[in-house]
Amino acid sequence: MDVSSKVVVQVLLLALVVQVTLCQHWSYGWLPGGKRSVGELEATIRMMGTGRVVSLPEDASAQTQERLRQYNLINDGSTYFDRKKRFMSQ
């Protein structure tokens, strides 16, 4: 590799590194520094204040309804703890 091609490769590499280090990701609706634009916030508050409820369509599949079913995580039978308690008391 001659000197001129090495210089070109180094300049390109430097340009890529500078671009990656100086770029900033802006999420949708957010301004730099994590600030949200006031207009979008007002629109969100207005939408929440209307009281509209989003419901599932009537022809929702059984799989979708099963996925959205509530789970009872508190009353799960506690079989592990019951076995451990019986083992410790023996």
Curated annotation (Swiss-Prot):
Modified residues (Glycine amide): 33
InterPro entries assigned to the protein according to its UniProt record, in alphabetical order: GnRH, Gonadoliberin
Organism of origin: Oryzias latipes
Record has Secreted as a keyword: yes
An example Gene Ontology biological process: camera-type eye development
Subcellular location as annotated: Secreted
PANTHER family: GONADOLIBERIN (PTHR10522), PROGONADOLIBERIN-2 (PTHR10522:SF6)
Residues bearing the modification Pyrrolidone carboxylic acid: 24
Family named by the database record: Belongs to the GnRH family.
Chief localization: secreted
The keyword Signal appears for this protein: yes
Its job: Stimulates the secretion of gonadotropins.
Signal sequence residues: 1-23
GO cellular component terms, semicolon-separated: extracellular region; extracellular space
Keyword vocabulary terms for this entry: Amidation, Cleavage on pair of basic residues, Hormone, Pyrrolidone carboxylic acid, Secreted, Signal
Protein name: Progonadoliberin-3
Tissue expression summary: Expressed in neuron cell bodies of the nucleus olfactoretinalis.
Note: Teleost species possess three paralogous GnRHs: mdGnRH and cGnRH-II have been identified in tetrapods; sGnRH has no tetrapod ortholog and is thought to be a duplication of cGnRH-II.
